[in-house]
């Protein structure tokens, strides 16, 4: 889905959470507790008007807050980007509160890893920290399924949109950009 665009920049670094050594902090336990009434459904990706409206609402908010570019997504664009796959590992995590869709996380669940592809949510429910809750739910599922890593995509230290990822410690960063015949070199980090 996402690849670095800058040819001579190495700031975007692949990162993964070390699930086996991950311990939920007190504040993370509070986030989990706040969401005790939030329902989580895991199923193959789909597209509904509720998905599209929430996706657009999230991106309008991020446009105002962080100056992200914003264009409403069409059903076809959403379908091509997130739904059209024949792979059984592609899932969506639906977060429902009071019978309303308040968050969607698009996730690949494989035998040895979970890959967090994308997450969007309703900022009207910011008190629930749905973005954090989604990552914590993925960590919990990875622990239950004995999956060693969760890949959070690219990380840039202290970046206003990607810096949050370093809170999920311990994590590892990819030290090289290997081709298919090379081994990956991962370095452990603590926040």
What are the language-model segments listed below?
Residues 2-9, 14-127, 167:
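A conserved beta-strand-loop-helix scaffold within acyl/acetyltransferase catalytic domains
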Residues 108, 133-136, 153:
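Active-site scaffold segments
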């Amino acid at each position: 889905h996402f690849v670095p665009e800058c040819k001579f920049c190495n700031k975007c670094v692949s990162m993964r959470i070390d699930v086996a050594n991950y311990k939920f902090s007190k504040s993370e336990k509070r986030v989990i507790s706040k969401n005790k009434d939030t329902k989580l459904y895991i199923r193959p990706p789909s597209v509904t008007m509720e998905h599209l409206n929430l996706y657009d609402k999230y991106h309008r908010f991020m446009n105002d807050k962080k100056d992200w570019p914003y264009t409403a997504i069409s059903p076809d664009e959403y379908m091509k980007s997130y739904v059209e796959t024949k792979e059984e590992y592609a899932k969506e995590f639906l977060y429902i509160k009071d019978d309303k869709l308040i968050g969607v996380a698009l996730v690949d669940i494989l035998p040895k890893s979970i890959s967090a592809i994308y997450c969007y949510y309703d900022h009207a429910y910011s008190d629930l920290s749905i973005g954090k809750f989604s990552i914590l739910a993925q960590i919990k599922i990875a622990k239950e399924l004995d999956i060693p890593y969760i890949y959070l995509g690219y990380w840039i230290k202290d970046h206003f949109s990607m810096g949050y990822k370093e809170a999920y410690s311990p994590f590892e960063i990819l030290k090289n950009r290997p081709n298919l015949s090379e081994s990956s070199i991962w370095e452990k980090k603590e926040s």
